[in-house]
Amino acid sequence: MAQMTMVQAINDALKTELKNDQDVLIFGEDVGVNGGVFRVTEGLQKEFGEDRVFDTPLAESGIGGLAMGLAVEGFRPVMEVQFLGFVFEVFDAIAGQIARTRFRSGGTKTAPVTIRGPFGGGVHTPELHADNLEGILAQSPGLKVVIPSGPYDAKGLLISSIRSNDPVVYLEHMKLYRSFREEVPEEEYTIDIGKANVKKEGNDISIITYGAMVQESMKAAEELEKDGYSVEVIDLRTVQPIDVDTIVASVEKTGRAVVVQEAQRQAGVGAAVVAELSERAILSLEAPIGRVAAADTIYPFTQAENVWLPNKNDIIEKAKETLEF
């Protein structure tokens, strides 16, 4: 075991798969010589060579097209969209081509592409850099979408993503890159895509969340427990497909739920979670499902995000409202 940041854990996972499989290729804007904007791929080109870890032109659509072509020829491309806001430039290649390969070929071809994308608030980026677009990607048939909440999950989920025979969007919250360390096994391991993690068990209310909001939810749970409430916190880990069985089982136990996301409120992952609970756990609910999310506006830039991002106080307020209903 080693103490790692999320950047180190992702780098370790990439290194593991480059060693294990000669068909794994890593490419994107600045990922080679410079090791990426956040130095996530630092040292990989030097160790594995320019044929396997390389820079591309500043053309996201070209990166996606390259990944598609390599995938159907038997490679396992790991492509980076430098900031998730730039995914609009390559959306046709991802959702219109890569995601549909198995379907269009009648199962004779697959596209084992891993699409890495830094996203999320808390680091005061320019506009169109931090956008939470997981909801759009999750609504694209053929894609799996995973979002690790810390170093341990980051390594295990990335190895699973690269080994998947179908495309996986692997989203990396920028605030989590170096904000804390966890014990991470130095040997290889995988975490099942599509399986949520019960981060903390409780009996009075279920807080269901993912990404950076896991940390905020854990802080909120700690404060709520000082007031005598027993709080369960569930980290979805994967937002497509959602682990419906785990969240339903939790709500059937607690009778109350708050769904937390950093993204805008409408038509996102949180809305999908609420819909699933309404269909499958409605008779267990003792209060309306609470929701915590950002406002339905364009993502603000730099310091303005401080008043836009949900935080632990928002979660505590909504949880108490639900508990006292």
Curated annotation (Swiss-Prot):
Q: Which cofactor does it need?
A: thiamine diphosphate
Q: Which residues bind thiamine diphosphate?
A: 60
What SUPFAM superfamilies does the record tag this protein with? Thiamin diphosphate-binding fold (THDP-binding) (SSF52518), TK C-terminal domain-like (SSF52922)
Q: Which InterPro entries match?
A: THDP-binding, Transketo_C/PFOR_II, Transketolase-like_Pyr-bd, Transketolase_C
Give one Pfam family, short name only: Transket_pyr
The Enzyme Commission number assigned here is 1.2.4.1
Catalytic activity reported: N(6)-[(R)-lipoyl]-L-lysyl-[protein] + pyruvate + H(+) = N(6)-[(R)-S(8)-acetyldihydrolipoyl]-L-lysyl-[protein] + CO2
Q: Which UniProt keywords apply?
A: Oxidoreductase, Pyruvate, Thiamine pyrophosphate
What is the role of the protein in this entry?
The pyruvate dehydrogenase complex catalyzes the overall conversion of pyruvate to acetyl-CoA and CO(2). It contains multiple copies of three enzymatic components: pyruvate dehydrogenase (E1), dihydrolipoamide acetyltransferase (E2) and lipoamide dehydrogenase (E3).
Subunit structure, as described in the record:
Heterodimer of an alpha and a beta chain.
Q: What is this protein called?
A: Pyruvate dehydrogenase E1 component subunit beta
Taxonomic path: Bacteria, Bacillati, Bacillota, Bacilli, Bacillales
